[in-house]
């Protein structure tokens, strides 16, 4: 967890036991999976509003972004393993997505809208590219996981570099 607490400032400590927890895997048919060179996309199937070809085109843009980040920082996170982008209903309210591997993309926030914008406007997807930018922070690459507020700006700096290097588009609509 986060050492500084959650968005509401709470910190939990100690031990707790549950004896009624049941993990139920999502059925494979409920998930939409596509894979690029560096990125794996696993979304709720009902959120995917565009064609496989459109998703593949977006994944290609995300792969190019990954490569631009690699060129910028001189290294890759997670020993070069593919980064998964995973829909989840289970992240804290107020978060659009959380960086890591997987990048957790809130199922309740703009999934279909972002996919539609990639087709309609050629938009590369601010939120996801921003989160991939976090993955390329020094703390993530070095494995320390250290993060601070400065990286909110630096994730956007890395994103700006990648968009410029890849001739990418970020819509303001």
What are these model-derived regions, one by one?
Residues 146-173:
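Post-HExxH zinc-binding segment in Zn-dependent metallohydrolases
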Residues 1-21:
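Extracellular beta-strand ligand-recognition surfaces/modules
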Residues 11, 53, 76-78, 122, ...:
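Structural helix-adjacent loops and short alpha-helical linkers that scaffold large soluble proteins
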Residues 4, 25, 139-140, 157:
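Residues that line or immediately flank small-molecule/substrate-binding pockets and catalytic motifs
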Residues 22-33:
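Low-complexity, Pro/Thr/Ser/Gly/Ala-rich linker/spacer regions in secreted
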Residues 14, 62, 148-152:
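Active-site-proximal structural scaffolding
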Residues 32-135, 139-140:
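Juxtacatalytic substrate-recognition/specificity segment
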């Amino acid at each position: 967890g986060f050492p500084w607490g959650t968005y509401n400032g709470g910190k939990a400590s100690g031990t707790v036991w549950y004896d009624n927890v049941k993990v139920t895997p999502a059925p494979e048919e409920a998930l939409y999976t596509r894979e690029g060179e560096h990125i794996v996309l696993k979304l709720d199937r009902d959120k995917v509003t565009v064609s496989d070809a459109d998703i593949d085109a977006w994944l290609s843009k995300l792969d190019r972004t990954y490569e631009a980040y690699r060129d910028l920082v001189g290294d890759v996170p997670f020993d070069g393993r593919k980064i998964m982008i995973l829909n989840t209903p289970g992240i804290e309210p107020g978060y659009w997505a959380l960086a890591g591997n997987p990048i957790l993309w809130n199922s309740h926030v703009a999934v279909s809208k972002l996919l539609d914008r990639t087709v309609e406007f050629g938009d590369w997807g601010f939120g996801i590219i921003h989160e991939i930018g976090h993955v390329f922070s020094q703390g993530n690459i070095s494995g320390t996981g250290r993060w601070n507020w400065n990286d909110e700006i630096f994730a956007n700096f890395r994103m700006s570099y990648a968009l410029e290097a890849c001739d990418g588009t970020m819509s303001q609509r």
